[in-house]
């Protein structure tokens, strides 16, 4: 990995050495993407591309290229964002799998943001008890988070990702070309997961943001290196702990509080923005518990602010957010578990913090 943080980015392959080893390949263009999909899918005869509405043209182009290579390729359009991750949407996908005759030898392609890769992975995990899936994420958030690591799932009225399974992809295709047309708000939101990787593991990431926040949002600046670094952090964790029994919990930094904000806001908040305020709350919680310094918390605010991420949330009372946090999948024995930092780059768990600590962190995080 280069240290120049420049645009001289060459194709990069990051191996995720977990239960079923696979590669995340970072490059530019649909030609590269098609070639990597064919390589990863192996003897597949049939492809189903599950995609979001804005990606209909890219799905059609990919389908055309797969057909030209001698394969049957089908497309199925799903709703945008979290509205795609429902039991009804999953049932519609299963119907399409049956209609096009998808067998255990075939491959699903998840084309789109995190909701598309989450749903496509869930369909692949459940159709005929598991078929191959290749993820082709098209948002920054999906590239560095949702598409890597094998988590799949759909939402229920009770909460986010409560139904799902672990089902690793055969490959993840990170096509930097799609970032050229990604709305700025999506680029900013996706940055939250990269910043998170810096706070929990690779502190070099934080230095890159501090040196030039604008270059960190530029597909021809330092962003490609940041993407690779964030994926490497996740790959290193997932290789040790696929199913979130221990180490993988550190990837949830900012997520316990962030998911509560998302749920309370009925998913109107972008995931990255919610995780950003979650990191502030959890940094303030660590400070209240005597772990982090005021300077460490300020560093959180400064970096998140520098790329346009939210650093406070006052849309709900703490008790309302605690009710949502009480349903978090990481909880054990009725106690809410938080990922916090002992120091920058060194995460730990804080289980069942006192109401006094929670209220102090909440007051500080909303600026009270």
Curated annotation (Swiss-Prot):
CDD domains for this protein: DHQS
The protein, known as: 3-dehydroquinate synthase
GO BP annotations, alphabetical order: amino acid biosynthetic process; aromatic amino acid family biosynthetic process; chorismate biosynthetic process
Compartments reported by the entry: Cytoplasm
A GO cellular component entry from the record: cytoplasm
The species this protein was found in: Corynebacterium jeikeium (strain K411)
Metabolic or biological pathway: Metabolic intermediate biosynthesis; chorismate biosynthesis; chorismate from D-erythrose 4-phosphate and phosphoenolpyruvate: step 2/7
Pfam families given in the database record: DHQ_synthase, DHQS_C
Record-stated family: Belongs to the sugar phosphate cyclases superfamily. Dehydroquinate synthase family.
């Amino acid at each position: 990995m280069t240290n120049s943080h420049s645009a001289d980015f060459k194709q990069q392959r990051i191996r995720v050495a977990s239960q079923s080893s696979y590669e995340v390949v970072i490059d530019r263009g649909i030609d590269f993407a098609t070639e990597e999909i064919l390589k990863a899918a192996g003897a597949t005869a049939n492809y189903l591309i599950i995609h979001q509405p804005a990606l209909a043209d890219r799905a059609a182009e990919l389908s055309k290229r797969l057909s030209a290579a001698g394969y049957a390729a089908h497309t199925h359009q799903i709703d945008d964002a979290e509205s795609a991750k429902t039991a009804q949407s999953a049932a519609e996908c299963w119907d399409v799998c049956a209609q096009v005759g998808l067998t255990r030898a075939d491959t699903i392609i998840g084309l789109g943001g995190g909701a598309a890769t989450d749903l496509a992975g869930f369909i692949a995990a459940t159709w005929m008890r598991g078929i191959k899936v290749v993820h082709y994420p098209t948002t920054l958030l999906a590239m560095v988070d949702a598409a890597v690591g094998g988590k799949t799932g759909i939402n229920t009225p009770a909460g986010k990702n409560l139904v799902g399974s672990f089902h690793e992809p055969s490959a993840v295709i990170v096509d930097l070309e799609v970032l050229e047309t990604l709305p700025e708000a999506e680029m900013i939101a996706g940055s939250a997961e990269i910043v998170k990787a810096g706070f929990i593991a690779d502190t070099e990431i934080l230095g890159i943001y501090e040196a030039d926040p604008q270059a960190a949002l530029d597909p021809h600046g330092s962003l490609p290196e940041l993407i690779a670094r964030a994926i490497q952090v996740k790959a290193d964790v997932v290789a040790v702990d696929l199913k979130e029994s221990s180490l993988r919990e550190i990837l949830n930094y900012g997520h316990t509080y962030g998911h509560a904000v998302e749920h309370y806001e009925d998913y109107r908040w972008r995931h990255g923005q919610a995780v950003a305020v979650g990191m502030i709350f959890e940094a303030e919680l660590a400070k209240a518990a005597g772990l982090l310094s005021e300077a460490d918390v300020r560093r959180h605010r400064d970096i998140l602010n520098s790329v346009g991420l939210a650093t406070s949330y006052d849309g709900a009372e703490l008790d309302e957010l605690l009710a949502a946090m009480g349903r978090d999948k990481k909880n054990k024995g009725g106690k809410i578990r938080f990922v916090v930092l002992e120091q920058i780059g060194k995460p730990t768990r804080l289980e069942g913090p006192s109401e006094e600590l929670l209220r102090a962190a909440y007051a500080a995080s909303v600026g009270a």
